[in-house]
A protein has these predicted regions:
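Generic secondary-structure boundary/loop-capping signal
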Residues: 43, 68-70, 77, 148-150, ...
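N-terminal beta1-alpha1-beta2 module of alpha/beta enzyme domains
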Residues: 1-67, 71-72
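Flexible, glycine-rich active-site loops centered on histidine and acidic residues
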Residues: 2-19, 81-154
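Structural motif
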Residues: 42, 76, 106-108
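Short, flexible coil/linker segments at or flanking structured domains
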Residues: 24-27, 61, 76, 91-93, ...
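Conserved strand-turn element in the central/C-terminal portion of the radical SAM core barrel
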Residues: 74-82
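A short, hydrophobic/aromatic-rich structural module that often spans a beta strand
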Residues: 51, 56-59, 88-93, 156
Length: 156
């Protein structure tokens, strides 16, 4: 059995952001020092629904990689429908290199309509079929970027 910590950086008490980040670092260090297997960071935008305050799990992962020795670093999740697939694939691969191979990739389609409409109108959750097609295409491109030396893609 493996144990991971879902580090949902909620800010119910409206602390200064630097305080929230420092608390997140303390949790991360605690998990690393006490042999937890992994730590997972979220991606949410606009700090409204649920008060989640982490907008970029890869940046949080880079911070964790620089401060820890063994814990695996995951994203719960990268909302891939919000991002350019090649850029996101590159960023994940770079984090994996910076962390000496400790990355766990977590992906999703998004959950809050307001986030989707503001991050990428093509990811609108009101049209689930379109959102899913975008998700599939984005993931296909990301996999090609990770596994093929050269590739092309013809899509929507």
């Amino acid at each position: 059995m493996k144990f991971g910590y879902f580090c949902n950086t909620t800010n119910w008490k409206h602390k200064p952001y630097e305080t929230l980040l420092e608390e997140t670092r303390q949790i991360t260090n605690y998990c690393d020092e006490n042999s937890w297997d992994s730590i997972w960071y979220t991606e949410h935008h606009f700090n409204h629904e649920g008060m989640e305050s982490c907008t970029n799990p890869l940046m949080m992962g880079a911070d964790a990689a620089a401060r820890t020795k063994q814990i695996r670093i995951g994203q719960a999740c990268n909302v891939i429908t919000f991002h350019n697939p090649i850029r996101l694939a590159e960023d994940i691969a770079l984090l994996d290199q910076l962390s000496n191979g400790r990355v766990e990739v977590g992906i999703g389609r998004g959950v809050y309509g307001r986030e989707a409409l503001n991050m990428n109108k093509e990811a609108d959750l009101k049209d689930q079929a379109k959102n899913f097609r975008l998700f599939e295409e984005t993931l296909t491109i990301m996999k090609k970027a990770w596994t093929e030396e050269f590739f092309s893609h013809k899509g929507e």
